[in-house]
From Swiss-Prot:
Attaches a formyl group to the free amino group of methionyl-tRNA(fMet). The formyl group appears to play a dual role in the initiator identity of N-formylmethionyl-tRNA by promoting its recognition by IF2 and preventing the misappropriation of this tRNA by the elongation apparatus. Pfam families: Formyl_trans_C (PF02911), Formyl_trans_N (PF00551). InterPro entries: Fmt, Formyl_trans_C, Formyl_transf_N, Formyl_transf_N_sf, Formyl_transferase-like_C_sf, GART_AS, Met-tRNA-FMT_C, Met-tRNA-FMT_N. This is Methionyl-tRNA formyltransferase.
Length: 316
């Protein structure tokens, strides 16, 4: 058990998984900071973040500031007398005044291999780009966006069918262990701080809903990587045109590669194979498995296709 006093800042499930690893390892988490509760999509009732729910269940003191620059909030942070802050997907760029509070500084777990994929969406962007390797990077934070010196790195292979959601789970699991290793090194005085090579930096900004739009005029492998990269959020979608009707939105929840090929127009629906719908790309064919027509529930792609009175064309 370490003697470090740790304050943890995080918000989504990814961060909750890492926090649980620290709690299970009996790290002395003296306080937790998370974002304010957000209203649910179909209700005005606010919902607590996964990190808040975990902190409450473990009876860990909790703060939810409206602004991280608020003097009263900063004073409360100082009262916790932390040795180190651990930041995991908190969701706000922190100012230097806050970063200077803990004795040994603030350490951030970034779900990507820095300096590549700096930003809010490293997991999604690396899958969309067709990468086969990802990992976590722990940095000692400065006021820049993911620009701090590197303390530790690990690697996670990206499976050929892995979605962003699945990669996030894998990275959260291994990320907790990487933070533990870093805390041990901080206490032992052996932690390293290696400057990033900014010449190799790339950006991974947050994805918009519009970026979920599938562009069929691309190789099937690229289309498949795009669908996996935006799953589960913001989600892949296309437009379908049923004869005599206006174009409508079709969510794509699940897809896979098809071995067959041929000469077809991108976006052309080739028919049903088993439970799936075959769609042509610029090179190759993709199987749509689970889809969601606009305003309807998830369904098998075959059932969607059979429910159309006449021919269907996917627009790209």
């Amino acid at each position: 058990m370490l003697n470090l006093r740790v304050v943890y800042l995080g918000t989504p499930q990814f961060a909750a998984t890492v926090l649980e690893t620290l709690v299970d390892a009996r790290i002395h988490v003296v306080g937790v900071v998370t974002r304010a509760d957000k209203p649910q999509k179909r209700s005005s009732k606010p919902i607590a973040s996964p990190v808040k729910q975990l902190a409450l269940s473990k009876n860990i003191p909790l703060l939810q500031p409206t602004k991280t620059t608020d003097p009263a909030f900063l004073a409360q942070l100082r009262e916790w007398q932390a040795d180190v802050f651990v930041v995991v997907a908190y969701g706000v760029i922190l100012k230097q005044e806050l970063l200077d509070i803990p004795k040994y500084g603030c350490y951030n777990l970034h779900a990507g291999l820095l300096p590549a994929y700096r930003g809010a969406a490293p997991i999604q962007r690396c899958i969309i780009a067709g990468e086969t390797l990802s990992g976590n990077t722990v940095i000692r934070m400065d006021a820049g966006m993911d620009t701090g010196d590197i303390a530790n790195v690990n690697h996670v292979a990206i499976g050929e069918d892995m979605t962003a959601g699945e990669l996030a789970e894998a990275l959260a699991g291994s990320g907790g262990e990487l933070i533990l290793k870093t805390l041990q090194e901080i206490e032992a005085g052996t932690v390293r701080h290696i400057p990033q090579d900014s010449a190799k930096a790339t950006l991974a900004p947050k994805l918009t809903k519009e970026e979920g739009l599938v562009k069929w005029d691309a190789p099937a492998s690229q289309v498949y990587a795009h669908i996996r990269g935006v799953s589960p959020a913001p989600g892949a979608w296309t437009r379908f045109l049923s004869q005599g009707k206006e174009p409508r939105r079709l969510g794509i929840l699940s897809a896979r590669m098809e071995s067959s090929s041929g000469s077809h127009s991108p976006g052309e629906v080739l028919g049903v194979s088993g439970e799936d719908l075959l769609v042509a790309c610029r090179q190759g064919v993709l199987r749509l498995c689970i889809v969601q027509p606009e305003g309807k529930v998830f369904m098998k792609a075959k059932d969607f296709f059979n429910g159309q009175s006449r021919s269907v064309a996917l627009l790209f």
